[in-house]
Curated annotation (Swiss-Prot):
This is Chromosomal replication initiator protein DnaA. The keyword Transmembrane does not apply. Gene3D superfamilies: 1.10.1750.10, 1.10.8.60, 3.30.300.180, P-loop containing nucleotide triphosphate hydrolases. Coiled coil: none annotated. It comes from Rickettsia akari (strain Hartford).
Length: 463
């Protein structure tokens, strides 16, 4: 970030230029994922009495930025111009923009008794583990979390995020958020009628209704709810009759100001074998990408899970899991459960070595192959020592400590035995490697700076 003050007048063009500097700083600080979620569609409007006025695309985005980022944005503005005392964020139509209003045909539906709706109890299909309280929020999923929370808290009014379309890879938290919406509504607005089900089950119930000549009951059931949540909508791709029924259900609910939440493994525009009119409607509201997890988010998820389970796991094991199980949250939690279960059944202590052995097969499928040589090169470069120092016997601290760190990382990031690692470090025996690992583990207990340094090296080596 430029450390020089930019002296500005009240001319709009200058403030637009200033906002571009602030936006770039936000991008640099928070990264592409979070920037695209919140700031990319924010525009400068005007300045008045030392106040900069920005425009957000929706009330939802405006409120989230105000609550989470307003002070950071103000400080960035003041960095460039210290006469700015405050910022305000509004929502309004920008000059020169137009909105297309699509009129949906008005439909009516019969009011059916609660016993009919309750024949399928939503809460029997919700997982008690999946609530907002135990959803770990990070940059990759912040937009999706905030949108899901807004839908749940809408208290009967339809949110701006209608439909809310959540998409991303398997095991990243989409289903968790949908269940969390259901539980929140049950606890805070129990009179609201909610249906949650997979697209596959939606199709099977529709086919059953056709076979039993109960299509009218099917339509009434799904079109008389306050919130309809359909998981894995990609399942109806290529299924024309189900798509047709979903299309009319969607239209009826949206036309009657009912909330829809939909999940998918890809964005609406990337769906194949689905009608264009459905693609278009899926993108009407808020489309939120649940991105792949970062190391920090995986670490937070593990720590939260460990706290819930009230177990003790060594720090090096937690760091190892967060570094190695990168595919999705489901596999990450599964790996943790497997390690804990193995310890409970065998009465063996949870150690890094045991963890590596227990998860050997899973690690192979997740792991980019990292060699001891890769680690030696990265560590030598990081600490500005010669690569040959890794296999030397020099005892100078500036050489010995990086060598110990490289041995520690070799054990953490490869499946090599201590003896094999020792051979790569100038034919040292396994006791020397063991001493180095224990030394680093002891230092990690209290040395926060070293812990951050090793975490950084792990991330560099993983990607």
């Amino acid at each position: 970030m430029n450390t020089n003050q930019i002296i500005l007048t009240d001319q709009g063009d200058n403030y637009v230029n200033l906002w571009s500097h602030v936006a770039q700083d936000l991008y640099n600080h928070y990264g592409e994922t979070l920037y695209n979620s919140w700031f990319s569609k924010v525009n400068f409007i005007e300045s008045s009495l030392n106040t900069v006025i920005l425009c957000a695309p929706t009330n939802f985005v405006r409120d989230w930025i105000k609550s989470k980022y307003s002070m950071v944005i103000l400080q960035l503005f003041q960095h460039y111009n210290n006469t700015i005392k405050s910022i305000d964020i509004i929502t309004k139509e920008l000059p020169g923009t137009t909105q297309t209003v699509i009129e949906l045909p008005t439909k009516t539906f019969a009011d059916i008794g609660s016993s009919e709706l309750n024949s399928e109890n939503i809460f029997s299909t919700l997982d008690v583990r999946f609530t907002f309280d135990n959803f770990v929020v990070g940059a990759p999923n912040e937009l999706a979390y905030a949108a899901a929370r807004a839908v749940a808290e809408s208290s009967g009014a339809v949110s701006e995020s209608n439909p809310l379309f959540l998409y991303g890879g398997v095991g990243l938290g989409k289903t968790h958020l949908m269940h969390a919406i259901g539980w929140y509504i049950k606890q805070n607005n129990p009179s609201r009628k909610v249906i949650y089900m997979s697209a596959e089950k939606f199709m099977y119930q529709f086919v059953k209704a056709l076979r039993n000549k109960e299509v009218i009951l099917f339509k009434e059931k799904f079109r008389s709810v306050d919130v309809l949540m359909i998981d894995d909508i990609q399942f109806i791709c290529g299924k024309d009759s189900t798509q047709e029924e979903f299309f009319h259900t969607f239209n009826t609910l949206i036309d009657n100001n009912r909330q829809m939440v939909i999940s998918c493994d890809r964005s609406p525009s990337d769906l194949d074998n689905i009608e264009d009119r459905i693609k278009s409607r899926l993108g009407w509201g808020l489309v939120a990408d649940v991105h792949s997890t970062t190391y920090e988010l995986r670490l937070g998820i593990l720590e939260s899970k460990i706290e819930q389970m009230n177990v003790k796991i060594p720090k090096d094991v937690i760091d190892f899991l967060a570094s190695k199980i990168v595919s999705n949250v489901r596999e990450l939690e599964g790996a943790l459960n497997k390690v804990i279960a193995h310890s409970n059944f065998t009465l063996k202590e949870i150690t890094l070595e045991n963890t590596q052995n227990i998860l050997r097969d899973l690690l192979r499928s997740n792991e980019r192959i990292i060699t001891v040589e890769d680690i030696q090169k990265k560590v030598a470069s990081r600490y500005n020592i010669k690569l040959s120092d890794m296999s030397s016997s020099r005892r100078l601290r500036e050489v010995a400590r990086p060598r110990q760190i490289a041995m520690y990382l070799s054990k953490a990031l490869t499946l090599k035995s201590l003896a094999d690692i020792g051979k790569k470090f100038g034919k040292k025996d396994h006791t020397t490697v063991m001493y180095a690992i224990k030394k680093v583990e002891e230092l990690l207990e209290n040395d926060i700076e070293l812990r951050e340094e090793i975490n950084l090296l792990m991330k560099i080596l993983q990607h």
